[in-house]
Amino acid sequence: MTSQRTRERLIQRLYEEGLSNAQVLEVIRRTPRHLFVDEALAHRAYEDTALPIGHNQTISQPYMVARMSELLLAAGPLDKVLEIGTGSGYQTAVLAQLVERVFSVERIKVLQDRAKERLVELNLRNVVFRWGDGWEGWPALAPYNGIIVTAVATDVPQALLDQLAPGGRLVIPVGSGEVQQLMLIIREDEGFSRHVLGAVRFVPLLNGPLA
């Protein structure tokens, strides 16, 4: 079930659901999602669904990975992106093939260590990792042209807004429980523009690093 035909079916489905960025779709097509899930779930890797990866975390559904990547890239190529929530490393791997540099923060060290191994296996060398609190971002290396958050925050973290470069784009799910909305926030000359893009479902963005 990890055949090229299975991957092509996934890409066709994403296209039919309205995703149109050819570069993003090509990266999704060639990225081996089965490497980012447990072997017991590998037969489901190219279903358009989230899957558990342990520690009460999930690998996001391919549609959402592609959608959030499209939103980041909508204004053109990016050279410096901050990812909050490395998780399995799948979204990280997709970003690493779309932008010049990725800086990824994860609070669960064992998940990030596994993600590092997978990216090395795929020879993706333009990612720098930090084990820490995603609510804080990575201020030492700010600002970022794009920020993507792969867990739902109860509110938009001020630290992430502060670390967004002028013209930069922040893609983040906001809310709690059953009420979550995907938001696109753009840093403008006079402040921030906010766009609500529809209902989503993510695991919560928690505070503090966890070994």
Curated annotation (Swiss-Prot):
| InterPro entries per record | PCMT, SAM-dependent_MTases_sf
Please give the chief subcellular localization of this protein: cytoplasm
Provide a GO CC annotation, any one.
cytoplasm
Highest taxon of the source?
A: Bacteria
Q: Which UniProt keywords apply?
A: Cytoplasm, Methyltransferase, S-adenosyl-L-methionine, Transferase
- Which enzyme class? transferase
Where along the chain is the active site annotated? S60
For this chain's UniProt record, which GO biological process terms are given? methylation; protein modification process; protein repair
Q: What is its EC number?
A: 2.1.1.77
Query: What catalytic reaction does the record list?
Result: [protein]-L-isoaspartate + S-adenosyl-L-methionine = [protein]-L-isoaspartate alpha-methyl ester + S-adenosyl-L-homocysteine
Instruction: Tell where it localizes.
Output: Cytoplasm
The record's listing under PANTHER family reads: PROTEIN-L-ISOASPARTATE O-METHYLTRANSFERASE, PROTEIN-L-ISOASPARTATE(D-ASPARTATE) O-METHYLTRANSFERASE
Function of this protein?
Answer: Catalyzes the methyl esterification of L-isoaspartyl residues in peptides and proteins that result from spontaneous decomposition of normal L-aspartyl and L-asparaginyl residues. It plays a role in the repair and/or degradation of damaged proteins.
Q: Which family does it belong to?
A: Belongs to the methyltransferase superfamily. L-isoaspartyl/D-aspartyl protein methyltransferase family.
This chain belongs to the protein called Protein-L-isoaspartate O-methyltransferase
Name its species.
Pseudomonas fluorescens (strain SBW25)
Highest classification ranks of the organism? Bacteria, Pseudomonadati, Pseudomonadota, Gammaproteobacteria, Pseudomonadales
